[in-house]
Amino acid sequence: MDKKKYIRNFSIVAHIDHGKSTLADRLLEKTGTLTQREMEQQVLDTMELEKERGITIKSQAARLIYKRENGEEYILNLIDTPGHVDFTYEVSRSLAACEGAILVVDATQGIQAQTLANCYLALDNDLEIVPVINKVDLASARPDEIKQEIEDVIGIEAEDAPLVSAKTGLNIEDVLEEIVEKVPAPEGDENAPLKALIFDSYYDSYKGVVCHIRVKDGKVKPGTKIKLMSTDKVYEVVETGVFTPALMPLKEGLSAGEVGYITASIKNVRDARVGDTVTEAARPTEEALPGYKPAIPMVYSGIYPVDGAKYEELKEALEKLQINDAALSFEPETSVALGFGFRCGFLGLLHMEIIQERVEREFNLDIITTAPSVIYKVTKTNGESFDLTNPTNLPPMTEIAYMEEPVVKASIITPTDYTGAVMELCQDRRGKFIDMQYLEETRVVIHYEIPLNEIVYDFFDTLKSKTRGYASLDYELKGYEQSKLVKLDILLNGDNVDALSMIVPEVKAYQRGRAIAEKLKEIIPRHMFEVPIQAAVGSKIIARETVKAMRKDVLAKCYGGDISRKKKLLEKQKEGKKRMRQLGTVEVPQEAFMSVLKVD
């Protein structure tokens, strides 16, 4: 009997908040994978932060056993994927491990940007797509319209799409039937050399790195010597098994078509990269599975401990997070204003926020983070070129021939009423209009090319507020383009605060400088001497604000009396303030570093 016939590998894709994790919970419950006692909300979102924000950050997997009415038993491997645009690569690898994908669409909201993006990823991997319409128990649900929309926009048959409610558990059985009926059984040859895809990996302090794998060909069991194809390192498999979401060891190993995990005393997640191919050391496969890309950081930011003595602890915290997150990179850097810290690279803004929160939460450290910046390519007049991740390292303008910045292709889905507002926002952010298509009478998808550094700060928040939260955004890196950029420095009391430096387009330097100076004026507390806040490009000051000094009323004790007496006291005070200003240092509160981001 060929057991592959009874295996189905599928994942669930959806836009944020369309009910992906809740549907996964119901499927686990329906197939009796977990007892009622173990059942909690969002079982597959294991991180505290995931539960709190209601988002999936790491991919998870579970093995469900489904008995059909005719007595046949099927093994369904569910691979949960993150829905956020920062983790697109992780999603694409999870999808490559499946043969089918359930496309969850919210019956009240319809198709949104991420739905489309993830759906196209699934189509790129030749997956069978099973549409499921969720939240039909809500009064505002419009299942029939949405079916039509799925057919029109994505072009897949949706007439028989199950109408479910993951919250109440309505029609979940239909989803399981659809998976068995529509998703093809895995193919693969058990006797061929081993070929398996790592679609996720994490570090366990007892077992080393646990690799989630999908075996394409061959088989793997404890004792097999395996080789990872991107690094050519060889390990011996210690344990193989499946997920019930918890790890359950299986002595007999995994064979073609199955999804499970292996451990092989690997010390670092970087050695078992997502997307890599595992093969036998003795009998390697000819070629690796396609699509492997090392994770490339898109956004950089400085992280510093508030208390300089905690530098080593911060280093340890980042190292621990890095063990579990191959996409995080960091290197030590020093700042005149903030002391010793690290320059960290992230996949995107959400990834950055999550790492920062985890450092604060899991390691109880107080940190200061600087404004995020993207990677610029700088070419100097002597022909040398380099990647710039930190604005402070920019050479003087006279030595630069030209600079290039990353540009993304953004697709924004919005109700037609807000088309004008969205286009205005994109134009304002130096966007180049490409095209727009109507999805239906009331919704439109707009494509723009926008420089990444315009998106990094607060594009998403502004987009949401301009469209009352209805618009959704998805973007992918298009490449680098030349543009006129300058470095904006902020001087406090005549000293350059390096942590506030940023790179801005020349045309926006004045308004950005003006806005930052005004913002800092509100945030920096008054000192005993006056503090000038200046924004400068090169040696030219383009904006100035002054935080007035606190002063004692030195004339209070003079009642009447001669004017020269008063003058003498005022002069004396002025002298003192001047001396203070030369010696004094300006305290910059933590909010100042963050407020620079929110300037618009």
UniProtKB/Swiss-Prot annotation:
SMART domains: EFG_C (SM00838)
EC number per UniProt: 3.6.5.n1
Subcellular localization(s) per the UniProt record: Cell membrane
One term of GO molecular function: ribosome binding
Highest taxon, organism lineage: Bacteria
Sites where the protein binds GTP: D17, H18, G19, K20, S21, T22, N134, K135, V136, D137
Residue ranges of every copy of the tr-type G domain listed in the record: 5-187
Keywords: Cell membrane, GTP-binding, Hydrolase, Membrane, Nucleotide-binding, Protein biosynthesis
SUPFAM superfamilies per the UniProt record, alphabetical: EF-G C-terminal domain-like (SSF54980), P-loop containing nucleoside triphosphate hydrolases (SSF52540), Translation proteins (SSF50447)
A single BP term in Gene Ontology: positive regulation of translation
Record's GO cellular component terms: plasma membrane
Membrane disposition: Peripheral membrane protein
One of the Pfam families matching this protein, by short name: EFG_C
Keyword Membrane set for record: yes
Enzyme type, top EC level: hydrolase
Task of the protein: Required for accurate and efficient protein synthesis under certain stress conditions. May act as a fidelity factor of the translation reaction, by catalyzing a one-codon backward translocation of tRNAs on improperly translocated ribosomes. Back-translocation proceeds from a post-translocation (POST) complex to a pre-translocation (PRE) complex, thus giving elongation factor G a second chance to translocate the tRNAs correctly. Binds to ribosomes in a GTP-dependent manner.
PANTHER family, per the entry: TRANSLATION FACTOR GUF1 HOMOLOG, CHLOROPLASTIC, TRANSLATION FACTOR GUF1-RELATED
Protein name per Swiss-Prot or TrEMBL: Elongation factor 4
Source organism: Clostridium perfringens (strain ATCC 13124 / DSM 756 / JCM 1290 / NCIMB 6125 / NCTC 8237 / Type A)
Encoding gene (name): lepA
